[in-house]
């Protein structure tokens, strides 16, 4: 399931050359690049190249349809769109769109943009320079673009690195590269020297094979992916003694799934709660959690994160009472792109209103109690009935 590998030196050079090509096309600091590409090497190269120019990258999940691509493109008004021919439908005609190959070969990745041997001027350090836009799942209607700058990505790196997946080892991204779980974390993963296994199309048997073959210490993804791995016919053909943790987010994990995963992989299961707006950082069950915490809660705030449950008047409620979950974390988005009114309603006095209902139990763990809307979750993404 793996394509030709590319080393860090080559990745740096290729993204340098593509950055110069992007600059010749008019991308500059503050420009917006929209990627409607598979989760492969061209996506990664384009993201790095844009960042080297100070441009902002927004990604479209390949699973979305044409009408959804239309909404996302209109949300961010990109200066340039890169798309493969199977993922271009719905991109408005008035935008500048380039069709590119989805080839994962280093020699072919965005070849039309490469300026051999050239590199862009290095930008001065600026913690407030925007880097990426991650689209929300549309739990209250149309998706919104959550903007993240260097400051937030550095905070995420500080909070997220090490732990369950260590540093400098092998990792399989559990989401599409356009998802907040990848876009806000690729930076620290690359800086740590991680070997990333990029999968255009996630398949349980492929992931199980990679985990076994490369002795990958952490299983990551959403609950539905874990269920597919447990049910895959090839599961018992593999040795998973290497697995030290199962780290799952993007939606609830049923107790029966947690129990089965812990038993079959022989590893602890950390259920994570976060949101696009929080940068994928929030609450987590401990790897050494007792059954009550592991099976029925989303744990406690991770280091560096504050959490509160408040009523409709924004006042903290007593333990055991249900209210809206608020988070305070340096990883939270800068704003919603082009939506100051909703930003002001969501980011309040340094806190992020999640729109999720929760209560705190007698162990200090948080238990979710639904949302204030009627969306449902599919593979880590909220799905709007419309």
Language-model features: locations:
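Conserved AMP-binding/adenylation subdomain of ANL enzymes
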Residues: 154-170, 178-218, 232
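Conserved pre-ATP/AMP-binding loop-to-beta segment of ANL
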Residues: 114-135, 142, 164-170, 305
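Gly/Ser/Thr-rich phosphate-binding loop
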Residues: 191, 216-220, 230-292, 306, ...
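Conserved ATP-binding/catalytic segment of the ANL
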Residues: 316-320, 324-386
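ANL superfamily adenylate-forming
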Residues: 86-127, 154, 233
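Conserved AMP-binding/adenylate-forming core of the ANL superfamily
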Residues: 1-40, 44, 48, 65-70
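Conserved structural elements of the adenylate-forming
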Residues: 12-20, 127, 146-167, 174, ...
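Conserved AMP-binding A3 loop
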Residues: 5-9, 131-155
């Amino acid at each position: 399931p793996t394509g030709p590998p590319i080393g860090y030196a080559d990745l740096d050079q290729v993204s340098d050359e593509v950055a110069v090509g992007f600059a010749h096309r008019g991308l500059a600091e503050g420009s917006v690049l929209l990627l409607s590409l598979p989760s492969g090497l061209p996506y990664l190269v384009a993201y790095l190249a844009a960042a080297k120019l100070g441009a902002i990258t927004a990604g479209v999940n390949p699973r979305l349809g044409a009408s959804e691509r239309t909404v996302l493109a209109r949300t961010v008004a990109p200066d340039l769109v890169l798309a493969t021919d199977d993922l271009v439908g719905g991109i408005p005609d008035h935008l500048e769109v380039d069709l590119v190959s989805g080839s994962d070969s280093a020699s072919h990745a965005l070849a039309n943009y490469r300026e051999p041997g050239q590199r862009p001027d290095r930008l001065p350090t600026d913690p407030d320079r925007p880097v990426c836009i991650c689209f929300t799942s549309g739990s209250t209607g149309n998706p919104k673009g959550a903007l993240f700058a260097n400051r937030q990505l550095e905070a995420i790196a500080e909070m997220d690195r090490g732990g369950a997946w260590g540093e400098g080892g092998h990792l399989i991204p559990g989401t599409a590269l356009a998802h907040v779980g990848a876009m806000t974390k690729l930076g620290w993963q690359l800086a740590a020297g991680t070997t990333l296994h990029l999968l255009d199309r996630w398949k349980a048997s492929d992931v199980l094979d990679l985990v076994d073959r490369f002795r990958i210490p952490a299983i990551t993804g959403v609950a539905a992916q874990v269920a597919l791995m447990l049910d895959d016919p090839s599961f018992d053909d593999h040795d998973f003694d290497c697995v030290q943790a199962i780290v799952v987010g993007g939606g609830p994990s049923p107790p029966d799934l947690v129990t089965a995963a812990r038993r079959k992989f022989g590893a602890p299961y950390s259920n994570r709660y976060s949101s696009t707006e929080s940068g994928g950082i929030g609450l987590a069950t401990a790897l050494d959690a007792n059954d009550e915490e592991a099976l029925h809660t989303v744990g406690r705030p991770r280091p560096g994160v504050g959490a509160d449950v408040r009523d409709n008047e924004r006042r903290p409620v007593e333990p055991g009472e249900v209210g809206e979950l608020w988070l305070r974390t340096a990883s939270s988005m800068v704003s919603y792109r082009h939506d100051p009114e909703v930003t002001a309603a969501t980011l309040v006095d340094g806190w992020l209103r999640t729109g999720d209902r929760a209560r705190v139990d007698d162990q200090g763990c948080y238990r979710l109690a639904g949302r204030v809307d009627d969306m449902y979750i599919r593979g880590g993404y909220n799905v709007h009935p419309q």
